[in-house]
Amino acid sequence: MPILAPLGPSPLSEVFTYSNLPSPVEMATGKDYRHSKAGILSKLPPSIKPYAELLRIHRPLGYYLNISPYVVGVAYTAAIAPVSLPATVLLNRLIILSLWGFLIRSGGCAWNDLIDMDIDRQVSRTKLRPLPRGAISPTSAALLTAIIFGCGGLLLLLLPSQCTVEAGIILFFALLYPFGKRFSDYPQLILVNIAWAIPMAMSSLEVDPLDFPYSTLSMCIFIASVIVMIDVVYACQDAEEDKKIGARSMAVRYSDITDQLAYGFFFSGAISLLLGGVLRGLGLPFIVFSVGGHIFGFLRFLSVTLGEGTKSASVESRAKSSCLLATVFWVLGFFLEYLARS
């Protein structure tokens, strides 16, 4: 069977579909789609492009959000560890955990699209994704998903055994996420599993997260708050169409107070980050750069994005630049603390 076979109904989508779906806004077909002539997708062979789209390699925001917590986790652990950690070990863990975050993001996108295929056909922003438009068969997508998660499992062999437990928690919630919108108004809260990157990074460096329970918890709340804040703002783009097809989310449930909700998560993140460092004795470099950079980057993101309206096409680009800027400042503050203690 050709790998790019035309789609029939997906067994997964038949089981996990809404019973009250209206007629599609416009059913997606391959002829509706034109590949972008710019960006990374334009440089790939035509046979590879649908798979690259499935993994969202042209949408780096998700990769930032999945990889940056591991980067922060390594930097934070270096700054608070009871003994000075060698730079070579830190670099090794940074590379392995970044690859793990990349694979979890990639596999999660493919899995999400497998489960949401029929729903994606109803939403204008997603109806031309590779699975809904028939560019990839469900079987091929499922096989690719399994291979990606398998590669992630192989990476765990390079880390201490405790990391396998933490990786299992992260993977479980990643697989659960696409079902959240069917059963709850709070699917974004499932994304807090990404915050488990902090204890996983600590364990990878053989620093027990339970030795510092309050600071570790604060850092997890910090990461979770940032992830949910960005996802709530981003989800507002689809809120109206989600209402029509019965999809549930915090953006739908709290559509009248999205601004207040987003700012609430922003302040939660800033306070938790501050506590996570102060409880471990981090000082001025951390407060000025890590906390100050967080406030500057994401306060600007919210003021501009919510000011323009959450349906603005610039939401993703604003989130991407803010996340990248904030990550640089987070790591810089921790790195300066690490140097001061070395």
Curated annotation (Swiss-Prot):
- Spans traversing the lipid bilayer: 71-91, 95-115, 141-161, 163-183, 187-207, 216-236, 261-278, 282-304, 319-339
Q: In which pathway does it act?
A: Secondary metabolite biosynthesis; terpenoid biosynthesis
Q: What is the lineage of its organism?
A: Eukaryota, Fungi, Dikarya, Ascomycota, Pezizomycotina
Keyword annotations of the record: Magnesium, Membrane, Transferase, Transmembrane, Transmembrane helix
Any GO BP annotation? terpenoid biosynthetic process
Q: Which reaction does it catalyse?
A: 3,5-dimethylorsellinate + (2E,6E)-farnesyl diphosphate = (3R)-3-farnesyl-6-hydroxy-2,3,5-trimethyl-4-oxocyclohexa-1,5-diene-1-carboxylate + diphosphate + H(+)
Gene3D superfamilies, alphabetized: UbiA prenyltransferase
A Pfam family annotated for this chain is UbiA
Biological function: Polyprenyl transferase; part of the gene cluster that mediates the biosynthesis of terretonin, a fungal meroterpenoid that acts as a mycotoxin. The first step of the pathway is the synthesis of 3,5-dimethylorsellinic acid (DMOA) by the polyketide synthase trt4. DMOA is then prenylated into farnesyl-DMOA by the polyprenyl transferase trt2. Methylation by the methyltransferase trt5 then leads to farnesyl-DMOA methyl ester which is further subject to epoxidation by the FAD-dependent monooxygenase trt8 to yield epoxyfarnesyl-DMOA methyl ester.
Q: Which organism is it from?
A: Aspergillus terreus (strain NIH 2624 / FGSC A1156)
The record's subcellular locations are: Membrane
Q: What is this protein called?
A: Polyprenyl transferase trt2
Q: How does it sit in the membrane?
A: Multi-pass membrane protein
